[in-house]
A protein has these predicted regions:
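Extracytoplasmic "Venus flytrap"/periplasmic binding protein-like
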Residues: 1-47, 78-89, 180-181, 191, ...
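A structural signal for short loop-to-beta-strand junctions that line the ligand-binding cleft
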Residues: 4-5, 12-13, 41-79, 107-108, ...
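Hinge/lid segment of periplasmic solute-binding proteins
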Residues: 18-70, 95, 101, 119-122, ...
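Periplasmic solute-binding protein
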Residues: 20-30, 50-87, 112-134, 215-222, ...
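Conserved C-terminal helix/tail region of periplasmic/extracytoplasmic solute-binding proteins
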Residues: 81, 154, 277-323
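Extracytoplasmic/periplasmic substrate-recognition and gating elements
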Residues: 82-83, 147, 154-157, 188, ...
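Glycine-centered hinge/linker elements that transmit conformational signals in sensory
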Residues: 97-102, 135-163
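Long, aromatic- and glycine/proline-rich binding clefts that accommodate carbohydrate-like moieties
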Residues: 197, 201, 249-297, 304
Length: 323
């Protein structure tokens, strides 16, 4: 709709946009550069780095974060205890725990590996944990991340069906007792509590290779480059103030992109607090004007590594040629 509106010169003054798409539309000239206009706003220094960077292109700011989420590791406490395991903190521990909890009809681990943006969302934390970037995958670190996913499938610790599973499908497998650990986000927590009230589970940081990493999800405010930029900014300054964000952010199921608000969220909810902790390691997808093409290349590399269409090394080289 935003593209159609731009073509017809019929755009609103302010939009809410999925964070990985922000840079693409900024590159089209749809959004105004507000860098200088908001630099002295109260609380502008309170934003987490990841969410704020998702509003940027070439170091220029084209909006502000609305609300954020990220990915973490969910685990079935009973299954891990029965296998004599604790929640993994490293890749080696992840592979070990996944193998030990793979028994009968239960596989140890699952994550969405669809060949689309959802799959990329779930793969990038493993890529970034090695120190690699989304733009440079044809190296030892990029191949290592693809190999991790392939090894989990080859060991039987993760079903090959993950190439067909959405994040919702993964959650359903988890609450049905078919998997011991999964990658997922905070938006699943209310559903899990409602549909599986007797299931014993917890959340922890995604296991790391060289460093902790997670992928940022959420939405941003984008200011349209039109006649009403100043009016849009007046509203944005109000809507993104500390007190206003605190008044509505929980209703949207988001973690606040402002640290001074996020730190006061979920004070009685240890599970959601884990996601707030994970936010400090969450990175945006991009920001890059050609992110959709980059994302397609990354998710294809994961798919080909899992299915055996390509080796991780060949899949990385193919992805790099597109990127």
């Amino acid at each position: 709709q935003l593209s159609i509106g731009a073509s017809a010169a019929e755009l609103p003054d302010l939009v809410i946009i999925d964070s990985p798409d922000h840079a693409s539309y900024a590159a089209m000239g749809i959004f105004a550069d507000i860098s200088d206009k908001v630099s002295d706003w109260d609380g502008i220094d309170q934003y987490y780095e990841g969410p704020l960077n998702s509003c940027k292109l070439d170091d220029k700011l084209y909006g502000l974060p609305f609300g954020s989420n990220c990915l973490a590791l969910f685990y079935n406490e009973d299954m891990l205890a029965d296998a004599g395991c604790e929640a993994p903190t490293t890749w080696d521990e992840l592979k070990d725990v996944a193998q030990k909890t793979t028994q009968g009809n239960v596989t140890g681990f699952a994550m969405c590996c669809l060949q689309n943006e959802e799959g990329t969302f779930n793969f990038t934390p493993w890529l970034w944990s090695t120190g690699a970037t989304s733009y440079d995958i044809n190296n030892d670190n990029g191949i290592k991340a693809l190999t991790l996913v392939k090894d989990l499938v080859d060991a039987g610790s993760m079903s090959k069906e993950v190439i067909n599973w959405t994040q919702g499908d993964v959650m359903n497998q988890f609450i049905s007792g078919n998997i011991a650990m999964m990658v997922n986000g905070p938006w699943q927590v209310p559903t899990m509590r409602e549909q599986a009230p007797d299931l014993n589970w917890d959340v922890t940081l995604l296991p790391k290779d060289a460093e902790y990493a997670s992928c940022l999800g959420g939405e941003n405010f984008g200011v349209i480059d039109g006649d009403n930029v100043d009016a849009a900014l007046d509203f944005l300054q109000f809507a993104t103030s500390k007190d206003e964000v605190a008044s509505y952010i929980d209703d949207f199921g988001y973690i606040a992109a402002r640290k001074d608000v996020a730190e006061g969220q979920f004070t009685d909810d240890e599970t959601m607090q884990k996601f707030t902790e994970e936010m400090q390691y969450a990175q945006p997808r991009g920001p890059h004007a050609q992110w959709p093409e980059i994302s397609d290349a990354l998710s294809l590399a994961v798919n080909e590594s899992i299915t055996g269409t390509s080796t991780p090394a060949d899949a990385a080289a193919k992805a790099q040629s597109t990127i």
